[in-house]
Amino acid sequence: MALTWNSIISAEKKKAYYQSMSEKIDAQRSLGKSIFPKEEHIFTAFDLTPFHDVKVVILGQDPYHGEGQAHGLSFSVLPGVKIPPSLRNMYKELAEDIPGFTIPEHGYLKTWAEQGVLLLNTVLTVEEAKAHSHAKFGWETFTDAIIKKINDDMEGVIFLLWGAHAQKKGANIDTSRHFILQAPHPSPLSAHRGFFGCKHFSQTNELLRKQNLSEINWGAVTSS
């Protein structure tokens, strides 16, 4: 039977760590706390990028914790929401790296996901206005399992690991089967230390070309 995200996620949901985590999150919701993203958006990355379509993984940390920002894709925000600083810096690098790239007026990265870019956060929920509030709830175990499945069952996937957190998360990726591109995080705190000029977007397309796979059209960032 072909592997699907549905079968992979269903197997994780049966495990004790996941059930314990769900109880913690449900308890917070029942106390009236705002948890982002909305429940129906937690697994958006998997909905938009089927397992066997994954070509690239861009690993984020935890969801944006402001109202209306997080919608289940790392670094992305819904149309109409102000572009966050890290994504703005990603756009700046794209404008330097990819000929003809025009910086969009929104931060909605759905079209990347639909082309095979898994926009995966390490932690998939957060409490409003409390960064990293759901770290250690169990999401790290879940996303380790996701990365392991890609590592074990796919070949030639390109992992973009920006910053120490992502690089540590990707430490067990088999580089004889996959590709890793590392740079500092695009955050304003670190982008000038080597994210700008890393050329990861063009390098990704070069690696895809060498595998006879279609390139990512990074410039196809539409707001619908």
From Swiss-Prot:
Protein name: Uracil-DNA glycosylase
Entry EC no(s): 3.2.2.27
Species annotation: Aliivibrio fischeri (strain ATCC 700601 / ES114)
Chief location: cytoplasm
Keyword terms: Cytoplasm, DNA damage, DNA repair, Hydrolase
Reactions catalysed, as given in the entry: Hydrolyzes single-stranded DNA or mismatched double-stranded DNA and polynucleotides, releasing free uracil
HAMAP family, A to Z: UDG
GO terms for cellular component: cytoplasm
GO molecular function term, any single one: uracil DNA N-glycosylase activity
Highest taxon listed in the record's lineage: Bacteria
